[in-house]
């Protein structure tokens, strides 16, 4: 499964702009938004249109790396994990370029996992990132055919944003995390971090999109999929914060 995720990530990145190209600002991230809800709405509109580059451009990428206080963040976390630390500004200009690329790639990999979770064919154990044995003749063909048949991106074309739900209504514990979010914002070098919950209609069914957004000065960017509220709700990291209302 890990090899499959790597292959999907390579395809995603091949379809995305090179560093410093592709968006209106000449960067991987877009110009930012006037509110957290606008940032999430732009992400969902791009998702509906099957526009991966547009989805990723709603996130803080260059700004994320440029404003991050690596020492403060490591002190907050209390541990250095290479898989996380690679997106932190740890060195000079070269390493910062690497951190930007890693940040972009990790977001793309999260979207690859989300697509796989919701496209997963029937007849297999639930998707959890584990390997799937395809050792018999015809296994690979059947597996790929199942993924193609269940292509979640086709369903997402029917997505409509109905409105937004206050995260406190989703979990009474959200307000208790205000100090934790403030410490995170301080180490990230942003002014504010909030969770956003968008209420969606997808093919006549009610869904929610949970994610965190960050304010840098007057501009808002999406910060992370799932986000603080998603963790409180117990959402799978593979979900990318997208969950049917029936799951609650």
Tell what function each PLM region has.
Residues 1-27:
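Intrinsically disordered, low-complexity Ser/Thr/Pro-rich tracts
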Residues 26, 124-125, 138-142, 150, ...:
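Short beta-strand edge/turn micro-motifs at domain boundaries
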Residues 71-72, 238:
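Short low-complexity, flexible loop/linker segments enriched in glycine and/or proline
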């Amino acid at each position: 499964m890990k090899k499959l995720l790597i292959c999907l990530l390579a395809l995603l990145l091949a379809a995305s702009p090179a560093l410093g190209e592709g968006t209106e600002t000449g960067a991987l991230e877009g110009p930012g938004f006037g509110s957290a809800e606008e940032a999430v709405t732009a992400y969902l509109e791009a998702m509906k249109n099957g526009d991966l580059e547009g989805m990723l451009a709603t996130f803080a990428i260059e700004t994320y790396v440029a404003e991050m206080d690596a020492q403060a963040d490591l002190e907050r976390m209390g541990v250095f994990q290479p898989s996380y630390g690679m997106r932190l500004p740890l060195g000079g200009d070269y390493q910062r370029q690497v951190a930007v690329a890693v940040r972009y790639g990790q977001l793309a990999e999260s979207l690859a996992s989300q697509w796989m979770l919701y496209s997963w064919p029937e007849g297999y154990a639930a998707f959890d990132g584990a390997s799937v044995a395809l050792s018999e003749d015809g296994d690979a063909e059947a597996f790929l055919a199942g993924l193609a048949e269940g292509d979640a991106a086709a369903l997402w074309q029917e997505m409509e944003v109905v409105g937004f739900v206050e995260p406190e209504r989703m979990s009474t514990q959200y307000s208790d995390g205000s100090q934790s979010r403030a410490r995170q914002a301080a180490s990230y070098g942003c002014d504010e971090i909030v969770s956003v919950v968008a209420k969606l209609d997808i093919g006549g069914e009610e869904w929610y999109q949970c994610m965190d957004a960050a304010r840098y000065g007057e501009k808002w960017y999406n910060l992370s999929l799932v986000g603080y509220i998603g963790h409180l709700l117990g959402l799978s990291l593979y979900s990318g914060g997208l969950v049917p209302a029936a799951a609650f």
